[in-house]
Structure formats: structure tokens, C-alpha cells
């Protein structure tokens, strides 16, 4: 790669440390452009003529993302990655869900013809769109930045997008055996889809993920089950945990998105998944964001369980107290940055903790996975 990020090697080293529960990453979700010197003279495309072009025209999006990354700050560990997301849980659209472009996001509506059959159609237009979008972005990137993996999602969340949340919750009682079978079918399709998209976006073995703008030296994914706020611990261990575990066993680097205080009771089941590398915490509506002292004990519990953490929307005034309380190893900070002055302030704060964070050599880590993979690894 001839990347626009001049310190990419240092950032990759910090990511490898973090996957191995060491050190600090200073990043942010998405990017900002305020007072940023462009990395290249990339003109902005003409404004999208409508929402359909804004989201579903691969060439327009590739041109827009090329301009976007070229004009975004890449200081600290902010990654050069094009966000190719096609809505949260776009695997559901690949399986028949209906796309609707909004002003700020893409909605995926249930398939009106869904009949409980989980079928992958390689000719489905939504699947073709995924591939065409990533190929267009990869060609436009020209090695200057990563093309991110879309937010596919998995499991119950995908099924809920296909048929509706209420129906999935009823299935846990009315047809649990069928539901288990569907979870395995979705996982099997997930791996097929993931592998094909990975082969489009990969840089060597490396890749980046759109959600949380993250990087890994091999295959990585963000996993979740937002519907789990509405199910019991027993149901989680039956309908979620086994399939998350399979993903963690087959994908080298995995981050679980734990969303909302209503999902916290599933943390013990997550910590039981030995192969899971890290957990991201989203407090949810009405709660303080990830840098709040309210979550210190949660982060400590995750770290003590052998997982790295990702804290999101941390503000500058929260940064030092957070690190003082939870330590400086295995901590990924998704900061609430608005300009490069704030990034530089945060870098100075984090530098104070670098000596207390154990160094791990890149060469060693590339060959010693934090969660040993057996021969079933998809690397």
C-alpha cells in the first residue's frame, strides 16, 4: 500500500498489541475534515441526484469516499478506511430484505415473501450490489486506504430484520429447534459471504472493518446480538453463544458489540467464549457515553476476563480519569474528536501511559494469536 496515513506502521503495531490485550489505541468512529490539509488533490463528485444514487450507485460512492478519505484527518490511530456499509445488518438484504435509503442511513425492511427458508441466491441484486460497491471502491482506493468490510451482522439480528423482531422472539418458544437450524444456516451463509467480500477488500492478509473503523492483520469481524436485550440468559446460551463462538473460531480477530444495559446480563456468556478477542460497549439511549465513570467496573470486568475493550465517544476530559481507573493495556479509545487540536491533546495524554503499557513485538504477535486457532481457521 502507498497509504495516505504516514504513521500506519505504528498504528498497525498498536492494533496488534491491542488484539493481544496490550497497549492503547487512540482512534475515532468515522472521521472529521475541519481544518485538515488534504492528502491528495481529489475533487468532490457532483452532489448525488437522489438517495438512491447516494447509497446504491457504486461508482458515485467510490468517488465520494475517495474524496472523503483524502480530506479526513488521519492523526493518531485514525485509520484510512472507506465506509462501504449498506445499512446495519446488510446480510439480511442479501437474503431478501428490502433496502431503503435514508438521509443518514440505510434501512433494511423485512422480506414480504419470507417463509422461514434461509436461502442464499448468488444472483440476488443486493448481493451483486455488495460486490460491485467494494470492487469500485477498491479500484478507486489504489492502495491509498483500506476498503472497509460492510456491517453484515449475523444470527438473531439478521433473522429479525428478515421477518420481524416479535416473530423471532416467539420462535424461541414456539419453534426453538427450527430457530437453532436457522441460526446455523445464517452462520454458514455468513462465512461464504464474508470470505468472498474479504477477498475483494484484503490488502495482503490485512483488512479493515467499517464499523468502528478497525484494523487487523488478518480476517476480523464485529459480532453482535442486539435483540439479546429481550431474551433470557438461557436463550442466549442456546440461540446466540454457540454461533458467536463458531464465528470467533473461524475468524482470526473478533470484536463483540455489546449494546445497552439490557444486554449486560449476557457478559458472563461472552467471557466464556475463549476465542473472542475484544468487547465494545455501547451504553444505549439515556445513558452516559463510554468514557463515563459509570462504566469503569464493566471495563475492569471485561479486561479481567481476558478480553480487550473498546470505549466509544470518550471526551477529552474523560480520557485521563478513564485510563487512571482501568489501566493502559487492551484499551481501544473511540474518541469524540472534532479537530486536530483535540487529537494532539489526546495524544499527549496517552503518551503519559505508554511506559506503563507492556510492549509486544510485532514479529512474535503475528505468529502467536491471542486466541489460538485450530485448523478450521479461515485465514
Mark where each language-model region is:
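A diffuse structural propensity rather than consistent per-protein peaks
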Residues: 114-115, 315
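Conserved small/polar residues in nucleotide/adenosyl-binding loops
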Residues: 367-372
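Active-site loop segments of alpha/beta catalytic cores
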Residues: 1-51, 63, 68, 75-83, ...
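A contiguous, low-structure linker/loop signature
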Residues: 83-114
Amino acid at each position: 500500500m502507498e497509504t495516505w496515513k504516514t504513521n500506519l506502521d505504528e498504528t498497525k503495531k498498536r492494533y496488534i498489541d491491542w488484539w493481544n490485550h496490550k497497549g492503547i489505541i487512540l482512534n475515532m468512529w468515522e472521521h472529521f475534515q475541519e481544518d485538515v490539509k488534504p492528502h491528495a488533490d481529489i475533487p468532490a463528485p457532483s452532489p448525488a441526484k437522489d438517495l438512491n444514487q447516494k447509497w446504491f450507485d457504486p461508482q458515485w460512492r467510490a468517488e465520494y469516499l475517495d474524496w472523503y478519505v483524502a480530506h479526513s484527518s488521519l492523526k493518531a490511530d485514525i485509520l484510512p478506511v472507506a465506509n462501504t456499509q449498506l445499512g446495519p445488518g446488510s446480510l439480511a438484504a442479501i437474503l431478501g430484505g428490502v433496502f431503503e435509503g435514508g438521509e443518514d442511513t440505510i434501512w433494511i425492511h423485512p422480506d414480504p415473501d419470507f417463509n422461514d427458508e434461509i436461502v442464499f441466491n448468488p444472483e440476488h441484486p443486493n448481493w451483486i450490489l455488495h460486490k460491485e460497491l467494494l470492487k469500485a471502491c477498491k479500484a478507486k482506493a489504489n492502495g491509498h486506504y483500506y476498503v472497509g468490510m460492510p456491517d453484515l451482522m449475523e444470527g438473531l439480528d439478521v433473522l429479525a430484520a428478515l421477518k420481524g423482531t416479535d416473530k423471532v422472539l416467539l420462535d424461541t418458544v414456539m419453534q426453538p429447534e427450527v430457530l437453532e437450524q436457522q441460526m446455523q444456516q445464517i452462520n454458514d451463509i455468513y462465512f461464504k459471504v464474508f470470505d468472498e467480500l474479504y477477498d475483494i477488500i484484503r490488502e495482503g492478509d490485512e483488512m479493515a472493518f467499517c464499523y468502528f473503523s478497525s484494523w487487523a492483520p488478518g480476517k476480523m469481524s464485529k459480532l453482535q446480538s442486539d435483540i439479546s436485550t429481550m431474551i433470557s440468559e438461557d436463550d442466549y446460551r442456546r440461540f446466540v453463544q454457540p454461533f458467536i463462538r463458531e464465528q470467533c473460531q473461524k475468524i482470526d480477530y473478533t470484536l463483540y458489540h455489546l449494546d445497552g444495559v439490557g444486554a449486560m446480563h449476557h457478559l458472563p456468556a461472552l467471557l466464556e467464549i475463549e476465542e473472542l478477542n475484544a468487547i465494545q460497549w455501547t451504553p444505549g439511549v439515556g445513558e452516559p457515553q463510554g468514557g463515563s465513570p459509570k462504566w469503569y467496573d464493566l471495563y475492569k470486568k471485561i479486561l479481567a476476563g481476558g478480553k480487550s475493550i473498546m470505549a466509544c465517544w470518550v471526551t477529552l476530559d474523560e480520557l485521563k480519569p478513564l485510563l487512571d481507573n482501568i489501566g493502559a493495556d487492551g484499551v481501544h479509545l473511540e474518541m469524540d474528536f472534532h479537530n486536530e487540536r483535540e487529537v494532539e491533546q489526546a495524544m499527549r495524554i496517552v503518551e503519559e501511559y505508554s511506559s506503563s503499557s507492556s510492549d509486544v513485538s510485532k514479529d512474535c504477535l503475528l505468529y502467536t494469536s491471542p486466541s489460538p486457532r485450530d485448523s478450521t481457521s479461515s485465514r
